[in-house]
């Protein structure tokens, strides 16, 4: 029988053993939780080579879902960026911060949190690509867009984010070109107008000329004011100020800037606000396709307004009207970006096959002396005597000749041909 004095040391031993178990069990639980989290991260990241490499480099530790201040800062910055995705015309359904935060709160187990960790990284990379270089692949939208999208390295993107100020890094992803800034500002302005009265009533008249009066003139005035082409005015007459506003509108939309609101101008003025907003969103996407350094000196050809500009250090030093291919068939001008390789002085113009067989051959069949300023050449490049050719025997498929306009002041290409590497 143990006396109380004898039992005391034994009780101390049992107490120490119990305390040791109490300390060991939580440690084991914590280790198990860490292991479950990292295992879930490893398994989820394995589906994406870039994420697998990224998380392997950090021993499958998280950077979004933890309780640390840095994790919380990254998480908040990402949710703030997602909430502004619509301002950039991006599909907001891809990154709905409310849904994502609800999923985060629902992730109670370490394994669920590990899977959510990788999902946040996947969403971050998706957002980074969308806002940097566009949601769509150009060649899959329009076949004549021969543009290589300047995709960034996904690994470099997520690694750079981890090592940077989260909010600053996310802000720097969008294009910084003046064009993109103007488009975004216009998008926000149009969205504000959508919540008001829009552009107001459409112009009912088929055409309007300076000196006109009436309800259609008032509608035209109000739409020009709302669009930003005319200062506020109460005029009910198509006066000088309205004529100048119409000219500004025409110039901005690739129309003949004569100050007369003809059928084409009225049609353009009457385009609904919602359609204008969609045009802005499309233009912003196109700007994202171009989100790469353009060089201190570059040539910018705007197909939509028929202009070509030389830009030196963000300043236009030369501007000219330019000829753009028709939208039908193979005449459409391609869209591309590349380095100019060389130029040709006093060039010859080699007529495209489509123009030869669709325009010139029918004229030559009616009159062999037609388009006399153009030479007809054989497969060796020798000039053919057109009077010796029976053009009526040929079809568009069988016509064996080429056509060339020699160098001259009247040459279709002018006196200098800048050689872009057309696709």
Place the predicted regions along the sequence by residue.
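Cationic-aromatic interfacial patches
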Residues: 33-148
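Sec/Tat signal peptide C-region and signal peptidase I cleavage site
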Residues: 25-32
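Short amphipathic alpha-helical segments with coiled-coil-like heptad repeat character
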Residues: 3-4, 132, 314-317
């Amino acid at each position: 029988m143990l006396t109380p004095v004898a039992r005391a040391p034994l009780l101390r031993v049992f107490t120490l053993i119990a305390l040791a178990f109490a300390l060991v069990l939580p440690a084991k639980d914590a280790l198990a939780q860490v292991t479950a989290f990292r295992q879930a991260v490893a398994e989820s990241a394995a589906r994406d080579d870039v994420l697998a490499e990224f998380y392997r480099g950090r021993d499958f530790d998280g950077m979004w879902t933890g309780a640390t201040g840095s994790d919380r800062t990254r998480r908040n910055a990402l949710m703030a960026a997602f909430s502004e995705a619509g301002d950039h015309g991006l599909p907001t359904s891809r990154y709905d911060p409310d849904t994502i935060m609800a999923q985060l709160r629902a992730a109670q187990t370490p394994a669920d949190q590990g899977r959510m960790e990788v999902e946040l990284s996947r969403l971050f990379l998706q957002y980074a690509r969308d806002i940097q270089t566009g949601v769509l692949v150009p060649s899959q939208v329009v076949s004549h867009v021969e543009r290589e999208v300047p995709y960034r390295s996904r690994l470099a993107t997520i690694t750079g984010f981890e090592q940077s100020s989260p909010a600053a890094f996310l802000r720097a992803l969008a294009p910084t070109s003046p064009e993109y800034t103007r488009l975004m500002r216009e998008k926000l302005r149009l969205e504000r107008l959508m919540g008001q009265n829009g552009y107001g009533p459409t112009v009912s008249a088929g055409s309007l000329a300076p000196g006109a009066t009436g309800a259609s003139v008032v509608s035209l005035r109000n739409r020009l004011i709302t669009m930003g082409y005319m200062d506020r005015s109460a005029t009910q007459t198509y006066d000088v100020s309205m004529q100048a506003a119409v000219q500004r509108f025409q110039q901005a939309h690739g129309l003949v800037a004569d100050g007369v609101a003809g059928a084409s101008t009225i049609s353009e003025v009457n385009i609904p606000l919602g359609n204008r907003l969609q045009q802005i969103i499309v233009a912003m996407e196109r700007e994202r396709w171009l989100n790469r350094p353009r060089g201190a000196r570059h040539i910018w050809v705007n197909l939509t307004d028929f202009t070509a500009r030389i830009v030196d250090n963000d300043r236009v030093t030369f501007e000219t009207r330019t000829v753009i291919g028709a939208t039908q068939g193979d005449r459409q001008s391609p869209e591309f970006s590349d380095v100019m390789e060389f130029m040709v002085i006093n060039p010859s113009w080699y007529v495209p096959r489509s123009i030869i067989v669709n325009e010139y051959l029918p004229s030559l069949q009616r009159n062999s002396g037609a388009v006399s300023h153009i030479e007809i050449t054989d497969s060796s490049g020798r000039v053919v005597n057109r009077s010796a050719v029976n053009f009526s025997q040929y079809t568009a498929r069988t016509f064996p000749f080429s056509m060339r306009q020699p160098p001259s002041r009247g040459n279709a290409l002018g006196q200098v041909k800048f050689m872009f590497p057309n696709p």
